[in-house]
Amino acid sequence: DVNEETFIILYDNWAKDKKHVWYQDKIIETADAVSFSVDKSGLPKDKDHVFVYDVDMSSFRPSYCNIDVASAEHFVYKGDGQDWTWIRDKDFVYHDETKLDVDRNTFAPLGETHWWTDKDCIYMDSWNSSLNKWEVIKVDSLQSPIDTLNAGSHYLRNGRNIIYLANVIVKDIEVYRFEEVGLSKCIVNDMLFNNGNRILKDSLNVSEAKFYFYGHIATDKNHVFYSRKQLNDIDAASFHQIDDEIFEDKYYIYTHYCPVKVDK
């Protein structure tokens, strides 16, 4: 039953009257209607509780964490909008209702990348399947310069270190080349990495290598590789691309990425 005289719209999908609070068409039974509000950050709260979305309930409930209600706020906004899983109060940052050991005042997403930083460290949020929850992992101490190849890249330069997702894969080197060459493929100086693992260490001359077909094909003047496999029947010196997925050497045309020989 709605009391029409006191019914008001609070925020997107939120409303209340003098006795009840609604999220969409569901009454939030645990909410104190008199004190309930949605603050300017979009965080629902009453005098005693912050309310968080529960996937299993498909609705909101009071948070289990001991968060300071008065100062609590959402603070993470990415390309697809507000992220409800991140909350901070005057002292701490919380992710999925877990208090984090980070610096509250400087903790923030690193642009649209996979990482987060505060004044001291780099972090990444990762799904822990055994606990069935997200965790925030400390990856490395924060260095300078910090550089991503692009917003979706899995690689991050952190000063003299190179990070792949939540792992430091190269430590304490002078970085003079940092370049993405394919899907999860990256060159660091004269080293080639795929999914964070160094590949073709003693096979490919990375400094002169060319990459084709989203990085699946790599060549130098003596070798042609598809992924990690050397293709010995291709003439590397004359091998080149002639269309999006078509290549040739002095003997054959190779179609798609298999490659399949087609006589000239």
Regions found by a protein language model. Give the residues of each.
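Non-catalytic tandem-repeat scaffold regions and their flanking low-complexity/translocation tails
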Residues: 1-264
